[in-house]
Amino acid sequence: MNLFDDLPCQADEELFTELLSRRGVRIERIVSTGQSTPAGEPYNQEFDEWVLLVSGSAGLWIEGDGERELHPGDYILIPAHRSHRVTWTAKDEPTVWLAVHLP
């Protein structure tokens, strides 16, 4: 398998693919093609999430930290119960994320 297999050029929604799931740890590939999280609907998860931007670019807002622009190679830990949202993703190329969900 390859992280870049079957990347959509355009899609109505983000594509989530589970790559591995083991006792309390889940790794997934997320592919965005211009999507963002609606301003009034941030994520607030029960688990820590470590994300790596593999390709493309994106804006990520995290409660208490503000917004930051992410480029390939950038990574961040989003603590459990911290509101966050994707403010934008590249429209001209797929944005590929690697997300690791931790207890």
Language-model features: where?
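A short, N-terminal "cap"/entry segment at the start of jelly-roll beta-barrel domains
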Residues: 1-42
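Conserved hydrophobic/aromatic beta-strand scaffold that supports enzyme active sites
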Residues: 18, 27-29, 50, 67, ...
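A generic "binding-loop/recognition-motif" signal
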Residues: 23, 57, 66, 82, ...
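Residue-level recognition of conserved beta-strand positions in structured domain cores
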Residues: 29, 55, 62-64, 88, ...
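Tight coil/turn sites that cap or link beta-strands
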Residues: 35-36, 72-73, 79-81
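A short beta-strand-loop-beta hairpin characteristic of the jelly-roll/cupin
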Residues: 38, 44-45, 50-72
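Histidine-centered divalent metal-coordination motifs
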Residues: 43-44, 84
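Ligand-binding loop in jelly-roll beta-barrel domains
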Residues: 81-103
